[in-house]
Amino acid sequence: IDLIINLTIPSAHKEIIIKSLFNGKHCFSEKPLAMNFQEGLEIQKLANEKGLYVGCAPDTFLGAAGQKARKLIEDNRIGKIVLGTFNLMSHGMEHWHPNPDFFFKPGAGPVFDVGVYYITQLVNLIGPVKQINAISGTATNERTITSQPRYGDKIKVETPTTLMGSLVFQNSAKV
Protein backbone atom coordinates (compact mmCIF):
# COMPACT_ATOMS: atom_id res chain seq x y z
CA ILE A 1 0.00 0.00 0.00
CA ASP A 2 1.50 3.31 -1.11
CA LEU A 3 -1.47 5.65 -0.76
CA ILE A 4 -4.20 6.04 1.84
CA ILE A 5 -7.51 7.56 0.72
CA ASN A 6 -9.11 9.33 3.67
CA LEU A 7 -12.92 9.52 3.45
CA THR A 8 -13.64 10.10 7.13
CA ILE A 9 -15.61 12.97 8.65
CA PRO A 10 -13.77 16.34 8.74
CA SER A 11 -12.83 16.20 12.42
CA ALA A 12 -10.92 12.93 11.83
CA HIS A 13 -8.92 14.07 8.78
CA LYS A 14 -5.80 15.34 10.56
CA GLU A 15 -5.43 12.22 12.71
CA ILE A 16 -5.76 9.86 9.74
CA ILE A 17 -3.41 11.91 7.56
CA ILE A 18 -0.76 12.15 10.30
CA LYS A 19 -0.95 8.39 10.96
CA SER A 20 -0.65 7.72 7.23
CA LEU A 21 2.44 9.92 6.97
CA PHE A 22 4.07 8.41 10.08
CA ASN A 23 3.58 5.01 8.45
CA GLY A 24 5.29 6.10 5.24
CA LYS A 25 2.13 6.42 3.15
CA HIS A 26 1.05 9.20 0.83
CA CYS A 27 -2.49 10.41 1.60
CA PHE A 28 -5.35 11.85 -0.43
CA SER A 29 -8.10 13.20 1.79
CA GLU A 30 -11.66 14.26 1.41
CA LYS A 31 -12.14 17.97 2.10
CA PRO A 32 -11.29 19.85 4.20
CA LEU A 33 -7.66 18.91 4.63
CA ALA A 34 -7.70 20.12 8.23
CA MET A 35 -9.99 21.85 10.69
CA ASN A 36 -7.92 25.03 10.68
CA PHE A 37 -4.86 26.62 9.11
CA GLN A 38 -2.48 25.52 11.89
CA GLU A 39 -3.44 21.86 11.44
CA GLY A 40 -2.85 22.22 7.71
CA LEU A 41 0.63 23.59 8.36
CA GLU A 42 1.41 20.66 10.68
CA ILE A 43 0.34 18.19 7.98
CA GLN A 44 2.39 20.00 5.33
CA LYS A 45 5.49 20.08 7.57
CA LEU A 46 5.32 16.36 8.34
CA ALA A 47 4.72 15.44 4.69
CA ASN A 48 7.76 17.50 3.67
CA GLU A 49 9.91 15.94 6.41
CA LYS A 50 8.88 12.43 5.31
CA GLY A 51 9.17 13.18 1.59
CA LEU A 52 5.54 12.18 1.06
CA TYR A 53 2.65 13.70 -0.84
CA VAL A 54 -0.66 14.85 0.61
CA GLY A 55 -3.54 15.77 -1.65
CA CYS A 56 -7.03 16.93 -0.90
CA ALA A 57 -10.38 17.26 -2.62
CA PRO A 58 -11.74 18.95 -4.52
CA ASP A 59 -9.98 17.72 -7.60
CA THR A 60 -13.02 18.23 -9.83
CA PHE A 61 -11.34 21.27 -11.42
CA LEU A 62 -9.17 18.73 -13.25
CA GLY A 63 -12.24 17.34 -15.05
CA ALA A 64 -13.18 17.94 -18.68
CA ALA A 65 -15.42 20.98 -18.11
CA GLY A 66 -12.87 22.79 -15.95
CA GLN A 67 -10.04 22.05 -18.34
CA LYS A 68 -12.11 23.18 -21.35
CA ALA A 69 -12.95 26.46 -19.59
CA ARG A 70 -9.30 26.98 -18.69
CA LYS A 71 -8.24 26.37 -22.30
CA LEU A 72 -10.81 28.89 -23.57
CA ILE A 73 -9.48 31.49 -21.13
CA GLU A 74 -5.82 30.75 -21.94
CA ASP A 75 -6.56 30.98 -25.68
CA ASN A 76 -8.30 34.35 -25.08
CA ARG A 77 -11.50 32.98 -26.64
CA ILE A 78 -13.81 34.66 -24.11
CA GLY A 79 -11.92 37.88 -23.40
CA LYS A 80 -10.78 39.30 -20.11
CA ILE A 81 -12.72 38.20 -17.03
CA VAL A 82 -13.64 41.26 -14.99
CA LEU A 83 -16.78 40.32 -13.02
CA GLY A 84 -18.63 37.17 -12.08
CA THR A 85 -21.02 35.61 -9.62
CA PHE A 86 -21.91 32.20 -8.27
CA ASN A 87 -24.75 31.15 -6.03
CA LEU A 88 -25.48 27.99 -4.13
CA MET A 89 -28.73 27.57 -2.29
CA SER A 90 -30.31 24.46 -0.81
CA HIS A 91 -32.60 23.38 1.95
CA GLY A 92 -29.70 21.77 3.78
CA MET A 93 -28.20 18.34 4.26
CA GLU A 94 -30.77 17.38 6.88
CA HIS A 95 -33.33 17.00 4.08
CA TRP A 96 -31.56 14.22 2.20
CA HIS A 97 -28.59 12.82 4.14
CA PRO A 98 -29.34 9.85 6.44
CA ASN A 99 -26.83 11.03 9.08
CA PRO A 100 -26.22 14.77 8.53
CA ASP A 101 -24.89 15.79 11.96
CA PHE A 102 -21.26 16.35 10.90
CA PHE A 103 -22.33 18.88 8.24
CA PHE A 104 -23.30 21.24 11.07
CA LYS A 105 -20.12 20.88 13.13
CA PRO A 106 -17.02 23.13 12.98
CA GLY A 107 -15.01 22.32 9.87
CA ALA A 108 -18.11 21.62 7.82
CA GLY A 109 -20.96 23.83 6.63
CA PRO A 110 -21.71 25.04 3.11
CA VAL A 111 -18.34 26.63 2.30
CA PHE A 112 -16.32 23.56 3.31
CA ASP A 113 -18.79 21.06 1.92
CA VAL A 114 -19.86 22.56 -1.41
CA GLY A 115 -18.57 26.12 -1.79
CA VAL A 116 -15.00 24.88 -1.94
CA TYR A 117 -15.73 23.33 -5.36
CA TYR A 118 -16.73 26.70 -6.80
CA ILE A 119 -13.89 28.58 -5.14
CA THR A 120 -11.32 26.02 -6.33
CA GLN A 121 -12.63 26.25 -9.88
CA LEU A 122 -12.50 30.06 -9.78
CA VAL A 123 -8.89 30.04 -8.57
CA ASN A 124 -8.02 27.50 -11.27
CA LEU A 125 -9.60 29.67 -13.96
CA ILE A 126 -8.87 33.22 -12.80
CA GLY A 127 -5.81 32.87 -10.57
CA PRO A 128 -4.84 33.73 -7.00
CA VAL A 129 -7.13 35.74 -4.75
CA LYS A 130 -5.68 38.88 -3.18
CA GLN A 131 -8.67 40.03 -1.11
CA ILE A 132 -11.69 38.37 0.48
CA ASN A 133 -14.68 40.11 2.04
CA ALA A 134 -17.24 37.91 3.73
CA ILE A 135 -20.06 37.77 6.23
CA SER A 136 -21.70 34.71 7.70
CA GLY A 137 -24.56 33.78 9.92
CA THR A 138 -26.80 31.04 11.17
CA ALA A 139 -30.55 31.35 10.74
CA THR A 140 -31.32 28.84 13.46
CA ASN A 141 -29.34 27.03 16.15
CA GLU A 142 -31.14 23.76 15.51
CA ARG A 143 -32.18 21.78 12.43
CA THR A 144 -34.76 19.02 12.14
CA ILE A 145 -33.85 15.96 10.10
CA THR A 146 -36.50 15.22 7.46
CA SER A 147 -34.79 12.19 5.90
CA GLN A 148 -34.94 8.57 6.97
CA PRO A 149 -34.02 6.79 9.13
CA ARG A 150 -33.75 9.69 11.62
CA TYR A 151 -36.81 11.69 10.58
CA GLY A 152 -37.72 14.20 13.31
CA ASP A 153 -34.39 14.10 15.16
CA LYS A 154 -32.84 17.48 16.04
CA ILE A 155 -29.30 18.61 15.19
CA LYS A 156 -27.39 21.37 16.97
CA VAL A 157 -25.94 23.85 14.44
CA GLU A 158 -22.34 24.73 15.37
CA THR A 159 -21.11 26.37 12.16
CA PRO A 160 -22.35 29.18 9.90
CA THR A 161 -24.92 28.01 7.38
CA THR A 162 -25.39 31.25 5.45
CA LEU A 163 -22.39 32.93 3.86
CA MET A 164 -21.85 35.78 1.43
CA GLY A 165 -18.56 36.93 0.09
CA SER A 166 -16.63 38.64 -2.63
CA LEU A 167 -13.26 37.70 -4.04
CA VAL A 168 -10.85 40.13 -5.65
CA PHE A 169 -8.29 38.29 -7.76
CA GLN A 170 -4.72 39.42 -8.38
CA ASN A 171 -5.68 40.24 -11.98
CA SER A 172 -8.41 42.59 -10.58
CA ALA A 173 -11.35 40.34 -11.53
CA LYS A 174 -14.14 40.44 -8.96
CA VAL A 175 -16.52 37.58 -8.15
Q: Predicted segments — roles?
A:
Residues G24, G51, G79-I81, V129, ...:
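A general structural motif
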Residues P160, G165-S172:
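Active-site beta-strand termini and strand-to-loop segments that position acidic
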Residues L3, E15, E42, K68-K71, ...:
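Alpha-helical elements of Rossmann-like donor-binding domains used by nucleotide-donor carbohydrate transfer enzymes
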Residues A12, K25, P32, G55-F61, ...:
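Rossmann-like NAD(P)(H) cofactor-binding subdomain of soluble oxidoreductases
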Residues E42-D59, I78-F86:
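Rossmann-fold dehydrogenase core element
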Residues N23-K25, K50-L52, Q170-K174:
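A short helix->loop->beta-strand "cap" motif at the edges of active sites that frequently abuts
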Residues T60-K156:
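Predominantly a Rossmann-like dinucleotide-binding segment in NAD(P)-dependent oxidoreductases
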